[in-house]
Amino acid sequence: MARERPPGRGCGVLRRCLLGAVLLFGLRLCAELRRAGPGSPTRSAPPGPAWRPPGPHLPPAPGQPRGASRRQVTYVRSGRRAPPGGGGSGTPEPGCCAPRGRPRRKGPRWHIDLQPWAGSAQSLDEEAWRFLRYISTTQIACNHMNTDSLATDSSPTHKPWSVCLDDRFNLAHQIRNKQCRLYSLGLGSDDTHFEVSMANNGCEVHRFDPSVKSAHILESQHLWYHRLSIDWRDPHPAVAAQKPHSNTRKLGSILNEFGHHKIDVLKADLESAEWKVLENLILEDVLEQIGQLIFEIHLHWPGFEVSGSDSSVVRFWYSLLKELEQKDFRLFHSYKDLSKPQLFLKKDIFNASSCYTLSWVNTRWK
């Protein structure tokens, strides 16, 4: 005779099967969620605040404000790609960045390309002769120099600050149309005949001199004086925060602050700071905004923050000038100042002067 099952036993087995199936489904669902990760929901999330998974969240590290980690990562990345004119560190100040609609074409360069040694001996004699020959040999002919034919003031200039007025380089046309702009970088020089002459011819002239008493002075209709010193670096952010009106800037920063995109003529007499300033103009592609360069160079010592053996210093100088040539600047005038000490790196050698005035024209300038 068959045994009867206890009441409800079959239902119990069924319940256990159902519970097991539910448990298995739950475990699988958890595994899928873990595999997907917290970032996957953001792919389909609508625009707006970032999606955050429900539940408790870890607090930020001690001393770190909420959301700071995300902002810091974004800042570092954008800082590396930022144009070098912004100073390279710290929160950008108003006017420090390139104008809208004018994106930088290249990333920043950190050093110039050194030219090969002049000879296998890597000696001072080899480097000096190559350099002196280079600065004494013009690369392009200019038939009309200076502003004598246009100037209302016929007195002779005190120094040979020569500009090229050949029609093919457009400066004479800009002067006649009162549309030229001159930047003059100096350190307390009383010789302003060149600036006054250019202003009298209708050029917009900005002279930067840290010895000026007021921040900005309008000397005449077209001549401005600014109490600013052009450097090869912007002030450190900590210093800038304490002195928001610091009078030291890179030329690229000045251009951005003034809203100027082009300089027809850049004249510089920086008393041995010219090498580092020129290096900065090269590395940050500011040269593309300049039509003609007139630099007084000093050779009696290496210059500010230029170091190394004598031969390596001269090689650095030569490499800077070759960078100008590679950017389509051509030397059209060279003046050897015999009134200055005849010294070359503190030595009376090579029949060299300690001071030369060199003028270049940007052959691609329009």
Curated annotation (Swiss-Prot):
Q: Which InterPro entries match?
A: Methyltranfer_dom, METTL24
Primary location: secreted
The signal peptide annotation in the UniProt record is 1-29
Q: Does the keyword Transferase apply?
A: yes
Ranges of compositional bias, category Low complexity: 91-100
General function of this protein: Probable methyltransferase.
Region of interest called Disordered, as start-end residue ranges on this chain = 36-110
CC terms in the record's Gene Ontology section: extracellular region
Residue ranges annotated as compositionally biased, kind Pro residues, are: 44-63
A biological process term (GO) from this entry: methylation
Q: What class of enzyme is it?
A: transferase
Alphabetically, the GO molecular function entries are: methyltransferase activity
The cellular location(s) given in this protein's UniProt record come to: Secreted
Species lineage: Eukaryota, Metazoa, Chordata, Craniata, Vertebrata
In its UniProt entry, what is this protein called?
Answer: Probable methyltransferase-like protein 24
Q: Name one Pfam family in it.
A: Methyltransf_22
Which EC numbers characterise this protein's activity in its record?
A: 2.1.1.-
* Family from the record: Belongs to the methyltransferase superfamily.
